[in-house]
Design a protein with these regions (language model features):
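YjeF_N-associated NAD(P)HX repair module
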Residues: 71-186
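A cross-family phosphate/adenosyl-ligand binding-site feature
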Residues: 1-75, 80, 87-90
Length: 186
């Protein structure tokens, strides 16, 4: 999990999985003390239910925990979301490359880490997800090449944003073709 809203969503995912009996480990990429807002509240809830959180603030701590992570059945990528504007560097770049090198399915929250919501280009390393659960509406890099290969299968989670709000946003509008939609045309 990251330190922003995407990480906060990841904390909610971790809590939900634990409550459903799934063995779950949480890693924060960055310094835990920097987490604020809703993400901080969701992190505190993890503490209240006894879920330990491991801080990975540098390359050394990543190397220390990499072997444990390489044994997981699945990885939830909730590191960076729609706020990414520049290519990954340093620890984040290393982490994305290492995760991509594992034969473990990755589920990304909103967008795979390393992709920018504003572009379908891939500027450097980005997580290659098997599945992306994106919030509210599809994002450009999930449906347009060359970035779309990083998103894997895409599920748009309805989070209660009225369609009038989405259609009123500036920029391109995207609609996913679904089986149900095509069925109505045949």
């Amino acid at each position: 999990c990251g330190r922003g809203d995407n990480g906060g969503d990841g904390f909610v995912v971790a809590r939900t999985l634990k409550q459903r009996g799934v063995e779950t480990e949480v890693f924060v990429i960055g310094t835990i003390s920097d987490i604020e807002g809703d993400a901080r509240r969701n992190l505190e809830i993890l503490g209240q239910i006894g879920m330990p959180v491991v801080e990975i603030a540098d390359d050394q701590s990543w190397e220390l925990h990499y072997s444990a992570i390489s044994g997981f059945d699945i990885i939830v990528d909730a590191i960076l979301g729609t706020g990414v504007k520049v290519p990954l560097v340093g620890l984040l770049q290393t982490l994305a490359a290492d995760i991509n090198g594992l034969a473990i399915p990755v589920v990304s929250v909103d967008l795979p880490t390393g992709l920018s919501a504003d572009s379908h280009d891939v500027a450097g390393e980005a997580i290659e997800a098997a599945l992306t659960v994106t919030m509210g509406a599809p994002k450009l890099p999930l449906v347009l090449p060359p970035a779309e290969i990083h998103g894997g299968d895409v599920i748009v989670a309805d989070i209660g944003i009225p369609s009038e709000v989405i259609s009123g946003l500036s920029g391109p509008q995207i609609a996913l073709i679904t089986r149900e939609g095509v069925r109505g045309l045949i």
